[in-house]
């Protein structure tokens, strides 16, 4: 394969249709950042930190491990797509109000993971164990996670 080859990817990003071009091995995180979506952080680049978490068809994924080519025909949501009409989403508001995070590097990934977790249909409220499991792929070096878990609990109570 010629390394200068590109593929065309048609997808929806934050509700807008896109036709993008990328090399076949390009990670989705890189492609999204090239579109100016800087909430998609490039942390570890090996799926360990969760800073690059986005939603693909409603499922939280590590976009550093997800090839851009796989986004063909998919609905992608980043933190930038969560606010509507200049108003923060319910989850964004909860994180801002609680002060659950400190430096902010992990915040976009945590918000997207929380959004996906809360969107899943359930018969019972999430338990603390389920929340911790749901956020396990998102590292935060500044906190002990309890305020983050409490924020998710608050989000669920008020949704």
From Swiss-Prot:
GO molecular function, one term: 2 iron, 2 sulfur cluster binding
The protein's required cofactors: [2Fe-2S] cluster
Pfam family for this entry, one: Fer2
Cofactor note: Binds 2 [2Fe-2S] clusters.
Domain of life per record: Bacteria
Keywords for the protein's UniProt record, in alphabetical order: 2Fe-2S, Iron, Iron-sulfur, Metal-binding, Purine metabolism, Purine salvage
Gene3D superfamilies (UniProt xref): 3.10.20.30, [2Fe-2S]-binding domain
Task performed by this protein: Iron-sulfur subunit of the xanthine dehydrogenase complex.
Subunit structure and binding partners: Heterotrimer of XdhA, XdhB and XdhC.
Protein's recorded name: Putative xanthine dehydrogenase iron-sulfur-binding subunit XdhC
Gene that produces this protein: xdhC
């Amino acid at each position: 394969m010629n390394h200068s080859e590109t593929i065309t990817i048609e997808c929806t990003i934050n509700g807008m249709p896109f036709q993008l071009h990328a090399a076949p091995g390009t990670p989705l995180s890189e492609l999204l950042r090239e579109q100016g979506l800087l909430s998609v952080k490039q942390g570890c680049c090996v799926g360990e930190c969760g800073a690059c978490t986005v939603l693909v068809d409603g499922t939280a994924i590590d976009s550093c491990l997800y090839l851009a080519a796989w986004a063909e025909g998919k609905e992608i949501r980043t933190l930038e797509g969560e606010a509507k009409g200049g108003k923060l989403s319910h989850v964004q508001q909860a994180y801002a109000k609680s002060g659950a995070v400190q430096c902010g590097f992990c915040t976009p990934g945590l918000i997207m993971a929380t959004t996906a977790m809360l969107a899943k249909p359930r018969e019972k409220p999430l338990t603390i164990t389920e929340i911790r499991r749901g956020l396990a792929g998102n590292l935060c070096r500044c906190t002990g996670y309890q305020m983050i878990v409490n924020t998710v609990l608050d989000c669920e109570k008020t949704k």
